[in-house]
Amino acid sequence: MHKSLASNAFTLSIFLILFLSIFIGWTQSKLKSEGYFLKPICVKIQSGENINSVSTRLAKLELITSPVIFRIGASYTKKSSLLKAGSFLIPAKSSMLEIIKLITDGGKNTCGKEVLYKIGVTSEKIVVRNFNPNTGKYLETLNFNLKDDVKPKSYIDLTDEQGVRYRIIIAEGVSSWRIIEAIKNADFLTGSVTKISREGSLAPNSYEVGFGSTRESVIERMENKQNDILSKAWESRDLTSPLKTPEEALILASIIEKETGLPEERGLVASVFTNRIKNNMRLQTDPSVIYGLTKGRKVLGRGLKRSELILDTPYNTYINTGLPPTPITNPGKLAILAALNPDKTDYLFFVANGSGGHAFAKDLKTHNRNVNTWRNLNK
């Protein structure tokens, strides 16, 4: 009898092991199988939601075939407790495992409402937009100046809405003073700012931030980004460059950034200043003279006066030979790369051509002819 019981128990164990193996294999297959939904969808996870409520809701949306299997997958991958509040874009035909990964990894919002804070040389704008998962495009719903006395109610209400993404966009050529002042005005950030960052040390870029992030942490990210860009560019520099230090590269890049807004011209403008440095010629660049007058705290908004061109400041490159003592703005990555890897030319001069670009010249005679040509056209 004991042998019979042992035999039955052994048979049952084999059956259970076989059943579990088949069940695990079937479950894994279901978790990895493509979803049946043919269009991407934006799913919002509320703060405090658990895997049970989320799986039930996803099943109602027909994004998953079984909430039970979904929960098993989340438990098996040890992600049941890692749900992140926010809005997440679920691509068409995503498997259950892919969905689990999307709504638990990192917690970075990928769809829904987005607030853009655009900091430019002369403006600070808030743009609110919604992402349409079906078209893959954004629809702008709000656009206003953050300095306005009265903010739109629809913008104020966003502070109580979960899953809203916030992004700060810094344009190239904005001074540190202006960036810091704009960061102080950002009502979705917290904390104080104790100092103005060194000119040139903040990387123009796009930064996603969380609501309530500290201002100091955002500024630190900008500084770290610029340090990273500069150090990598310095390592790949043209070894024939007359620039002796990364700081000198940053100074020249800032001048290039203010002299041209055309990406295709950066290398040419860089070549002019590089050639002038090699020939021990004064740089004679207006933006540096202007910085000596404004320190980046305002836009001059007019041409330089003759008296200003002879005013003795460290930034007057019509009087002083060599680079100014500091950067004159925060240059972008392309300007930094251009400063360290300029085009190979013999150009020593350039003048604005009246259409956003410049006319370049190898000698003073040609340059003067270009100046007269564009002056006559602009009369």
Say what each PLM segment does:
Residues 243-245, 249, 263-322, 326:
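Small-residue-rich helix-loop
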Residues 304-313, 337-347:
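Short glycine/proline-rich, acidic loop/turn segments that cap or connect secondary-structure elements
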